[in-house]
């Protein structure tokens, strides 16, 4: 009987040991699986897909019907016949001016989707809308709004292509287009650096719009 009792006790210890090992293995396997899932989720959350071929549009309805027909050379982008600065002497225009005589006091529409970085007032800019787009383009709508109430969007707001963002109440709307990798922000934090320097900072807005114009 003693031998039988010792045999049962030894067998009992073996069973307990095997059960403990099985539970430990199961627990470790579960932890490993959970960790792998967390790692996968983190990887998915941090993966950014850069948008491609985002559409462009003109800022005024009249442009969609009649195209862009500036009345003066000084309204166009690039080297013009109008001196804009004397030190250094420069005839360079860093954007495109849409005059009241062409488009009237009409609504201004977003030429590209993006997020409003700032709505503010600046010397030489007037009230302006500064937009950063997901494809790293930058759009600045300036000089066309006499008062803040003429602007219909606010800082941090996401805007869509062709969304109404304001109303032209001044003599013209100056439209500037650049990219986030360009040196376009001046020491005061305004989006107008190199405004009188033809060094590639500013792009021709009309050419950019026509490159992928929404039909």
Where are the regions that the model predicts?
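Short, Lys/Arg-enriched N-terminal segments with co-localized hydrophobic residues
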Residues: 1-8
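Small beta-barrel nucleic-acid-binding modules, principally OB-folds
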Residues: 88-102, 133-135, 179, 189, ...
């Amino acid at each position: 009987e003693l031998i039988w009792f010792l045999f049962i006790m030894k067998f009992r210890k073996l069973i307990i040991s095997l059960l403990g090992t099985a539970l430990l293995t199961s627990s470790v396997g579960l932890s490993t699986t959970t960790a792998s899932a967390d790692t996968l989720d983190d990887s998915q959350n941090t993966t950014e897909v850069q948008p491609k071929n985002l559409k462009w549009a003109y800022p005024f309805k009249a442009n969609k019907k009649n195209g862009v027909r500036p009345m003066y050379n000084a309204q166009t982008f690039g080297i013009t016949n109008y001196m804009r600065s004397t030190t250094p002497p420069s005839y360079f225009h860093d954007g495109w001016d849409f005059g009241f005589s062409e488009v009237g006091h009409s609504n201004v529409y977003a030429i590209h989707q993006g997020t409003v970085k700032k709505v503010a007032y600046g010397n030489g800019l007037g009230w302006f809308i500064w937009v950063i787009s997901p494809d790293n383009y930058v759009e600045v709508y300036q000089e066309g709004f006499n008062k803040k109430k003429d602007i219909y969007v606010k800082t941090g707001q996401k805007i869509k292509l062709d969304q109404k963002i304001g109303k032209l109440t001044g003599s013209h709307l100056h439209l500037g287009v650049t990219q986030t990798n360009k040196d376009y922000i001046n020491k005061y934090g305004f989006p107008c650096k190199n405004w009188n320097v033809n060094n590639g900072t500013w792009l021709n807005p009309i050419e950019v719009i026509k490159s992928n114009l929404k039909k």
